A protein has these predicted regions:
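A short glycine-rich, His/Asp/Glu-containing loop-to-beta-strand
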Residues: 1-18, 73
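A cytosolic small-molecule/anion-sensing beta-strand core signal
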Residues: 31-32, 47-48, 66
C-alpha cells in the first residue's frame, strides 16, 4: 500500500517525545498505558482506545505517564520509516 505509514511503538514510563513537527498528518492510538500529548499548546492524556490527530506541520510533544503501546498512522507516507 502507498500513501501512508503505520508505526508501532513500545514506550517506557517517563520517556519524552521532544517538541517537533513534520509535513505528515498523524493519528495516534494508545493501545496500552497512558500518554500525555501536547498538540499546538493543548495538553491531553490519552488511554487505551483513544485516538489523537496531529495536523500536518503542527508542533507536538509528549510524555509516557506509564509504559505504553502506541500505533501511529502517518499520511503521506514517511520514507524514513520504510523497511526497504
Amino acid at each position: 500500500m502507498e500513501g501512508f505509514t503505520l508505526a508501532y511503538w513500545e514506550v517506557k514510563e517517563g520517556a519524552i517525545l521532544p517538541e517537533h513537527s513534520h509535513e505528515n498528518e498523524q493519528s495516534s492510538q494508545v493501545t496500552e498505558g497512558k500518554f500525555e500529548l501536547t498538540i499546538d499548546g493543548h495538553t491531553q492524556v490519552y488511554g487505551p482506545g483513544e485516538i489523537a490527530t496531529v495536523p500536518a506541520n503542527t508542533v507536538h510533544s509528549g510524555k509516557a505517564l506509564t509504559d505504553c503501546k502506541i500505533t501511529d498512522v502517518f499520511s503521506p507516507a514517511r520514507p524514513e520509516y520504510s523497511n526497504d
